[in-house]
């Protein structure tokens, strides 16, 4: 099994995540609400970028590629932990697709965030197994967790 730290892309993503974690406490206290919204939207955009090809594979629209799945699942696993501090109460009046329930039903929103993180972690773990059927089943669980959160907490376009 290869060392994940040997992969420069994984190193970069880990370093970026660590940097965000280290400065998030003090930086968020000073960060403008508009910037926090942009930060969470950027993370969600990246989640979509890495989820899209996997969703296509799950639906049979794109040929299954285990290498891409494993790489994208790893990115999604990391990204699934990043947007939540950008939903600070200070952002509730900033124009975005977030519904008021994000800020009024915080326990349910936290459960939805945890569900995505757990399902993304499981996807990354199963992606390393090489079991295409298991991977596709877990992709379904990730998609369901994304959709569940969007259904309850995101305005429909």
Identify the meaning behind each predicted range.
Residues 24-26:
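N-terminal signal peptide c-region/cleavage motif recognized by signal peptidases
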Residues 17, 21:
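Active-site-proximal loop/hinge segments that shape catalytic or ion-binding/gating pockets
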Residues 34-157:
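Sequence context surrounding c-type heme c attachment/ligation sites in exported
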Residues 3-15:
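Bacterial N-terminal signal peptides that target proteins for export
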């Amino acid at each position: 099994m290869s060392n994940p730290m040997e992969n420069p892309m994984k190193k970069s993503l880990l370093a970026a995540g660590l940097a965000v974690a280290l400065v998030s406490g003090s930086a968020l206290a000073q960060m403008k609400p508009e910037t926090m919204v942009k930060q969470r939207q950027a993370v969600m955009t990246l989640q979509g970028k890495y989820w899209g090809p996997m969703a296509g594979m799950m639906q049979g629209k794109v040929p299954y590629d285990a290498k891409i799945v494993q790489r994208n699942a790893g990115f999604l696993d990391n990204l699934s932990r990043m947007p939540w501090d950008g939903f600070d109460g200070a952002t509730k009046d900033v124009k975005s697709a977030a519904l008021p329930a994000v800020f009024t039903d915080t326990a349910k929103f936290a459960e939805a965030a945890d569900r995505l993180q757990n399902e993304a972690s499981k996807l990354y773990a199963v992606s390393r197994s090489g079991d295409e059927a298991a991977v596709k089943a877990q992709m379904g669980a990730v998609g369901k967790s994304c959709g569940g959160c969007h259904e309850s907490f995101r305005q429909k376009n």
